[in-house]
Swiss-Prot record:
InterPro entries: Ribo_uL30_ferredoxin-like_sf, Ribosomal_uL30, Ribosomal_uL30_euk, Ribosomal_uL30_euk_arc, Ribosomal_uL30_ferredoxin-like, Ribosomal_uL30_N_euk. This is Large ribosomal subunit protein uL30. GO terms for molecular function: RNA binding; structural constituent of ribosome. CDD domains: Ribosomal_L7_archeal_euk (cd01657). Residues 22-42 are annotated as: Disordered. One of its GO terms (biological process) is maturation of LSU-rRNA from tricistronic rRNA transcript (SSU-rRNA, 5.8S rRNA, LSU-rRNA). Keywords: Cytoplasm, Ribonucleoprotein, Ribosomal protein. Component of the ribosome, a large ribonucleoprotein complex responsible for the synthesis of proteins in the cell. The small ribosomal subunit (SSU) binds messenger RNAs (mRNAs) and translates the encoded message by selecting cognate aminoacyl-transfer RNA (tRNA) molecules. The large subunit (LSU) contains the ribosomal catalytic site termed the peptidyl transferase center (PTC), which catalyzes the formation of peptide bonds, thereby polymerizing the amino acids delivered by tRNAs into a polypeptide chain. Component of the large ribosomal subunit (LSU). Mature N.crassa ribosomes consist of a small (40S) and a large (60S) subunit. The 40S small subunit contains 1 molecule of ribosomal RNA (18S rRNA) and at least 32 different proteins. The large 60S subunit contains 3 rRNA molecules (26S, 5.8S and 5S rRNA) and at least 42 different proteins.
Length: 248
């Protein structure tokens, strides 16, 4: 009796194995389709982000040009150009917790200035102006320019995600937490803060208080005197930008 090895065609593939293969092929196709879909969405999103960034650059440039134009016009007329009141303040806590009365202590907590060298962006309102006046003996503050806002957020920016401090390494972190307010990337976040936009509160609350370094060269010898008396405390207006550079 002769025996022969069965050919490939003679061996029937079990139905369960066929179903498994079909299922795997379907899953593979679905995964690939999902990857392609994400690629297309990311490409579209990058284009949107790039377009927004271009728009912001033009907006910032136009505002600066208008300011220069008004200054020149005032100079020609022999008058003074009075700039618009600042809407944004950057506050830095530079004094510790010793001998703080309950009221300023509470306000420092509300402002999230819990440690020395913590910094936060604050919208200028009547209420915040009153609060700042009370905590002035513990803080340095002033009006940050665009360069300062950008450098702070890019270099020291952390977001509050599920009560955790998370580095802003990816635009997706911003989109997941602020996307519902139309803020989907770093440039959106910077724009919202710098222009004190309609969703400033959500944007500034998302940003974890900045942890700054001691200034290069140290604070002034009379650190706890007011800025106008040769110290570091209180309102230094545009001069806050120099301090930010030193501490960032």
């Amino acid at each position: 009796m002769s025996t022969s090895v069965p050919t490939k065609n003679d061996v029937l593939v079990p139905e369960t194995l066929l179903k498994k293969r079909k299922s795997q092929e379907k899953a593979r196709a679905e995964r690939q389709a999902e990857i392609e879909k994400k690629k297309a969405a990311n490409k579209e999103k990058r284009a949107v982000i790039f377009k927004r960034a271009e728009t912001y650059v033009k907006e910032y440039r136009d505002v600066e040009r208008e300011k220069i134009r008004l200054q020149r016009a005032a100079k020609q007329d022999g008058s003074f150009h009075i700039p618009a009141e600042a809407k944004l303040i950057f506050l830095i806590r530079i004094k510790g917790i010793n001998k703080i009365p309950p009221k300023p202590r509470k306000i420092l907590q509300l402002l999230r200035l819990l440690q020395i060298n913590n910094g936060v962006f604050v919208r200028v309102t009547k209420a915040t102006a009153e609060m700042i006046k009370i905590v002035e003996p513990w803080v340095a503050y002033g009006y940050p320019n665009l360069k300062s806002v950008k450098e702070l957020i890019y270099k020291r920016g952390y977001g509050k995600v599920n009560k955790q401090r998370v580095a802003l390494t990816d635009n997706s972190i911003i989109e997941e937490n602020l996307g519902k307010y139309g803020i989907i990337c770093m440039e959106d976040l910077i724009h919202e803060i710098y222009t004190v936009g309609p969703n400033f509160k959500q944007a500034s609350n998302f940003l974890w208080p900045f942890k700054l370094s001691n200034p290069t060269g140290g604070f002034r010898t009379r650190k706890f005197k007011h800025f106008i008396e040769g110290g570091d405390l209180g309102n230094r207006e545009e001069h806050i930008n120099a301090l930010i550079r030193q501490m960032n």
